[in-house]
A protein has these predicted regions:
Chain A
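Short glycine-aspartate micro-motif
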Residues: 3-7, 67-71, 158-162
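A short acidic Gly-Thr/Ser loop motif
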Residues: 6-12, 75, 161-166, 186
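ATP-binding/phosphotransfer module of carbohydrate and carboxylate kinases, centering on a glycine-rich
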Residues: 18, 22-24, 197-248
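Glycine-rich phosphate-binding loop plus the immediately following alpha-helix
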Residues: 34-41, 122-222
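Short, well-ordered amphipathic alpha-helical segments that serve as non-catalytic structural scaffolds
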Residues: 45-60
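Short beta-strand-loop/turn "lid" adjacent to the catalytic site in phosphate-handling enzymes
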Residues: 60-135, 174
């Protein structure tokens, strides 16, 4: 059985061809829903996804008539994607996600309906300043979480950490259902701080090559006590007046 | 979330190491910290989508295997 999986994020799309559970080819394009937000049109996203599909089929030596199933997840189901599917309310596990899948016609990328996996959002009603901290949502991390549940045989309550531009902390209950998530801008902040602030000089515009445990914990403690902005400036102070460098 | 909740940490190697150290150094959490290996996080989204499609009944069980 030949399957194509499409994973569209904010800035990237990855397509994999699978046969009998094994990856046989893949392709990636730097296109995502950010292009829709910037241009106000889905054309760039449609073209990028279609190109990634054709490249993957070419690498796999497959014709379109040899693909049995096309699955898609991530921001492709958002309002800036190619077919919007509402978030599923947590708690949601494998069964709930499976039941909520949608077969959608997206002729710009495939001649048959594409099966879409919805995202998941925290169960919070009447969102305002008083409870916004409790609200969060994901599109794409739910399939990654279910993959880790299956691959690692997770059978107890867990927090799955998925670092990225928007880092996710996904909470699972004992029934392997997603009960909610917390998202941070950690990845984007790290990128900006490293490359686009005065710290770029102290850090050689790069992340540490290796972790110094003492410095890592000191930094975390500092950010907790005096705030991220002040803790970040301490990096420049240490660079100016001590022997510490990017790797501590 | 209880203190004994286990953590499963994915991502790039240096980030995985840093996050694991932060969780292990946290006063509240005392559960197991499992750091995902590169092979375990290969093609994660596609693998998960196929597992969910299988639960939906869209493919036969042999089309996916636990790796």
């Amino acid at each position: 059985m030949n399957i194509l999986t499409i994973d569209t994020g904010t800035t990237n799309t990855r397509v994999f061809a699978w046969r009998d559970g094994e990856v046989i080819a893949h392709s990636a394009r730097q296109v995502g829903v950010r292009d829709t937000a910037i241009t106000g049109s889905r054309h760039t996203l449609e073209t990028g996804v279609q190109t990634a599909i054709q490249e993957t089929l070419h690498h796999a030596g497959l014709g379109t008539d040899q693909v049995d199933l096309v699955l898609a997840s991530g921001m492709i189901t958002s309002n800036m994607g190619l077919h919007e599917v509402p978030h599923l309310l947590a708690p949601a596990g494998m069964g709930e996600l499976a039941a909520a899948m949608v077969a959608a016609p997206i002729p710009a990328i495939w001649h048959q309906p594409v099966w879409l996996v919805p995202g998941v959002r925290n169960r919070v009603d009447h969102i305002g300043l008083h409870n916004v901290e409790a609200m969060d949502m994901m599109r794409g991390e739910e399939v990654e979480s279910m993959a880790l549940v299956k691959r690692l045989n997770i059978c107890e309550p867990a927090v799955i950490v998925l670092p990225g531009s928007h880092s996710k902390f996904v909470s699972l209950d004992g029934a392997q259902r997603i009960t909610g998530c917390v998202t941070t801008l950690a990845g984007e902040l790290l990128q900006v701080i490293t490359h686009n602030t005065i710290l770029a000089s102290s850090l050689d515009s790069g992340f540490a090559d290796e972790i110094d445990r003492e410095m890592l914990l000191a930094g975390a403690r500092s950010a907790k006590q005096i705030g991220l902005g002040r803790a970040c400036f301490s990096v420049r102070t240490l660079d100016q007046f001590t022997v510490y460098d990017r790797n501590a | 979330m209880s203190p004994g909740t286990q953590f499963v940490i994915s991502g790039k190697p240096v980030l995985r190491e840093a996050l694991a150290l932060l969780v292990q150094g946290d006063d509240f959490f005392s559960g197991a910290v499992n750091v995902v290996t590169d092979p375990q996080q290969t093609a994660l989204a596609g693998f998960g989508a196929i597992a969910i499609a299988q639960a939906r009944g869209l493919l036969e069980p042999a089309a996916i295997q636990v790796q």
